[in-house]
Amino acid sequence: MYVLSETKSNFLKLIAEALKRRGLEVEEEELERLAGRPPSPEMGDLGVSLFRYAKKLGLRPEELTSELKGEIEGRLAGVKEVKAIGGFLNVELEPSWLAERALREASREDYGKWSFSGRLVVEHTSANPVHPLHVGHARNMFLGDSLVRILKNWGADVQSRFYINDMGRQVAVLVYGLLKLGRLEPPEGEKPDHWYGKVYSVANALVELNSPSKGDDEKKEWEEVLKELESKWPEIVREMKEKFDDEDPEAKVSELMKKYEEGDPEVKETFRKVVNEVLKGFKETMERVGVNVDKWDWESDLVWSGEVDKIINMAKEKGLVIEKDGALVMVFKNLNDEVRRRLRIPKGLQIPPLVLKRSDGTTLYTTRDIAYTIKKFEEFRADRVINVIAAEQRLPQIQLRLALWELGFKEYAENLIHYAYEMVNVPGMKMSGRRGRMITLDWLLDEAERRVRELVEGRSEAEDVDEVVKKVAVGAVKFAMVSVSPEKPITFKWEEVLNFERNSAPYLQYTYARAVGILRKGGEPDLERADYSKAEKYKDMILSIAEFPEVARKAAEDLKPDLIATYLLSLADKFNEFYHKEPVAKEPDEGLRNLKLALVKAVANTIRRGLWLLGVEAPARM
């Protein structure tokens, strides 16, 4: 166990034992929630709030902490002093003892790794295969990839999956548009997902415009949309308009959906060919940002295998299905307070019945998602399944958990996590799917590279400037997406994302390169010759280094990559202050020089490890 984790665990055990002797049974986990680093060094290095226990025992807070201080003193390795400060019981660690252990730990390649044993599935990205990945998908992908890394670092066995939604209306609209154009393949030299995105936008506008169910006002709006699309892609619009001769294109789209769901060989071949081409574009972008997925799951395979029909039949057998206007609807019969609590459903939130099958016999996304969730749990024998899905999908995700519960898959329902995230806004740019206005991830990366190149060209020490530009650009975009808590929206501002002086990936990458540069000049530290007796001056930074494993563990337990981002920025600030004040390579005192070099190496390794958990590469030269 790591030095700070071990010290905290031993400290909390002694407190729990002392409280037990007074008749209070307190779990170590409960005490851990009340533990933390005191606000000032004078108060100690680790503390626990005991106010609530003093109240339960009918004691004044300072009375309880004073008693416990006497019982704990002399029983903890590495502790210089136990301090009772009001209702807080704190410990101050011996600097030389802490430094020797923490700096040795932090020099290891796998620093911050744990050995939790669990099996987890993380489904992320899962974009509709009809257009390129955009900024919203980017946040999804980078959060998902970071969760995979953080959970693996925790020691879990993790599988990442991408759900290919090939049975939705959007893919059918794209295929319909392509059939009208008379060609399925993208033009030579154009990235496939980008071309298909154009075709989809035009086809969707024409389907809506020519739909008999649309009123005059709606048609006027779609005419405006089509004009805007024509100004961007005149050839596609003109060519498709000429061939758009169906009286009711919406009915034709529905017919394509139905035929695909039924497994019509010709339609099946067409859909699969188109979707695979779009996925090629996705994979190219994902490779560019270093994101891999273990398993690609086709929605259609679930239907053709009969798994979705099994779900519908099971619901019928349990008396959960009613027929409404020809559609099959699942009603939730057991939505009581206990179920709401166990499935994390807010009190008072109305949950409508779930349509399983339309009147035309086709199934809906959430119906298929029930079968897919069971598949994810059973194929991987997962303890938990985490779905990284936008916050706006909150209701369908609640319906999914409820459906699993009603069908008897109670354990799956409780262990299915909707990892919700909010929108990404880029000032001065508006996204509109219907107007084909998309801030694509490809564009964002190109623009990041262009801006980074302007900043580093002529000033970079690296031999391969192109490689540095790519790493910094990708890292900057990734960090911007994962460093903000997922429940908060992001405003993506270039001046913040590419700030080399604070609060960004380039700042952390630059700090890492600076630390590695010092080690190039000063050499590797000799940990046996380091003078740990002089560690007092650097204790704050040593404590921060020692906190990394705990931060990595908490990020895994709470599913919060932003905790790592916040921690790294704080550590980098402390290191840069140290860098400006302290000579390292030129330090004449050998013992002190080795101590400082050990500090620099520990910071470099910690930043490298932390950035890796966020999916960001750390170049050795900038």
From Swiss-Prot:
Q: Where is this motif: 'HIGH' region?
A: 127-137
- Please name the GO terms that the record assigns under molecular function: arginine-tRNA ligase activity; ATP binding
**UniProt organism field:** Ignicoccus hospitalis (strain KIN4/I / DSM 18386 / JCM 14125)
User: Where is it mainly found?
Assistant: cytoplasm
By its UniProt entry, which PANTHER family does this protein fall under? Answer: ARGININE--TRNA LIGASE, CYTOPLASMIC (PTHR11956:SF5), ARGINYL-TRNA SYNTHETASE (PTHR11956)
Enzymatic class: ligase
What's in the GO CC field? cytoplasm
Q: Which InterPro entries does the record cross-reference, listed alphabetically?
A: Arg-tRNA-ligase, Arg-tRNA-synth_N, Arg-tRNA-synth_N_sf, ArgRS_core, DALR_anticod-bd, Rossmann-like_a/b/a_fold, tRNAsynth_Ia_anticodon-bd
Pfam families found in the cross-reference section: Arg_tRNA_synt_N (PF03485), DALR_1 (PF05746), tRNA-synt_1d (PF00750)
Among SUPFAM superfamilies, the record links this protein to: Anticodon-binding domain of a subclass of class I aminoacyl-tRNA synthetases, Arginyl-tRNA synthetase (ArgRS), N-terminal 'additional' domain, Nucleotidylyl transferase
Entry's Gene3D superfamilies? Arginyl tRNA synthetase N-terminal domain (3.30.1360.70), HUPs (3.40.50.620), Isoleucyl-tRNA Synthetase, Domain 1 (1.10.730.10)
Sorted UniProt keywords: Aminoacyl-tRNA synthetase, ATP-binding, Cytoplasm, Ligase, Nucleotide-binding, Protein biosynthesis
Query: What reaction gets catalysed by this protein?
Result: tRNA(Arg) + L-arginine + ATP = L-arginyl-tRNA(Arg) + AMP + diphosphate
In Gene Ontology terms, what is a biological process of this protein?
Answer: arginyl-tRNA aminoacylation
Instruction: Look up the domain of life of the source.
Output: Archaea
Record's subcellular location: Cytoplasm
Give the enzyme's EC designation: 6.1.1.19
Family per similarity comment = Belongs to the class-I aminoacyl-tRNA synthetase family.
This protein's name? Arginine--tRNA ligase
